[in-house]
């Protein structure tokens, strides 16, 4: 992250190449000392690593791994009962770019029964999606979903896209994953539905704010997995290779 005051001091800056998909913090001519600065992102570099992170946290929730973690650390040998599977599930993916599509492909390979894609454009979705919804029809796409995955960037249009009312459309057995931006989700409402058992679980790789303060109640929310915005970092070799190749192509 480059602070705005640093950007305003860079009088010779002509191109800002970001090694991230989201660049909302760098939008706006007022940020730069000189007009006409070219801004590029790395959308397309993170599908592999973030989709694998989604699958990891999703399986942890479906198989109740966080609950078993607590059980074994209390030195108990206890079967918690029913678990669930990606196989046969109905999945709603909000955001059908590189990340959402990479996840949908992997979920389909694991036997997901029906995958809905929610998008902001009228593009034709890849075959891994069984159904296509415009963002205006999000309520219909959420209804009846076993799994909801959020992969959208943080913009004015996506702020609190998942409201208290929309969380209320989910089933008691539903799980939600957010790898987009923390601003997309009403976190207070999420804490309420998790603590009251109105949905089964959630995993957040992004929060609002970031870093999440140590005293924030989100840390103590039931059936919630939190990771510190690491699903799409540069620690996977293939991600670095793709990112460097994209930079060279842009150059």
What are these regions, as identified by a protein language model?
Residues 109-113, 200:
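Conserved S-adenosyl-L-methionine
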Residues 36, 87-90, 112, 164, ...:
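Phosphate-coordination loops involved in phosphoryl transfer and adenosine-cofactor binding
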Residues 1, 19, 151-154, 178-179, ...:
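Short, well-ordered coil/turn residues at beta-beta hairpins
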Residues 68-102:
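Glycine-rich NAD(P)-binding loop of Rossmann-like domains
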Residues 1-69:
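Phosphate/diphosphate ligand-binding glycine-rich loop within oxidoreductases
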Residues 5-10, 26-34, 121-130, 213-220:
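Short loop/helix-cap segments at secondary-structure boundaries that form the rim of catalytic
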Residues 37-53, 67, 210-251:
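C-terminal helix-to-coil terminal segments
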Residues 122-217:
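Rossmann-like adenosine-cofactor binding region
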């Amino acid at each position: 992250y480059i602070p705005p005051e640093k950007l305003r001091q860079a009088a010779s800056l002509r191109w800002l190449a970001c090694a991230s998909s989201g660049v909302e913090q760098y939008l706006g001519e007022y940020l730069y000392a000189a007009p006409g600065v070219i801004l590029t992102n790395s959308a397309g570099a993170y599908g592999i690593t973030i989709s694998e992170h989604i699958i990891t946290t999703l399986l942890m929730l479906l198989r109740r791994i966080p609950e078993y973690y607590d059980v074994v650390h209390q030195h108990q040998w206890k079967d918690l009962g029913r678990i669930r599977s990606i196989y046969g599930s109905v999945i709603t993916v909000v955001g059908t770019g590189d990340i959402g599509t990479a996840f949908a492909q992997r979920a389909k390979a694991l036997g997901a029964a029906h995958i809905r894609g929610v998008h902001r454009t009228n593009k034709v979705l890849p075959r891994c999606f069984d159904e296509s919804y415009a963002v205006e029809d999000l309520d219909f796409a959420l209804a009846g979903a076993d799994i909801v995955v959020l992969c959208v960037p943080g913009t004015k249009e996506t702020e609190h896209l998942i409201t208290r009312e929309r969380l209320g459309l989910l089933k008691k057995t539903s799980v939600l994953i957010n790898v987009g931006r923390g601003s997309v989700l009403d976190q207070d409402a999420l804490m309420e539905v998790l603590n009251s058992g109105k949905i089964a679980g959630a995993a957040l790789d992004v929060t609002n704010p970031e870093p999440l303060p140590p005293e924030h109640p989100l840390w103590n929310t039931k059936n919630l997995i939190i990771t510190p915005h690491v699903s799409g970092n540069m620690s996977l070799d293939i991600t670095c290779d793709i990112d460097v190749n994209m930079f060279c192509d842009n150059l």
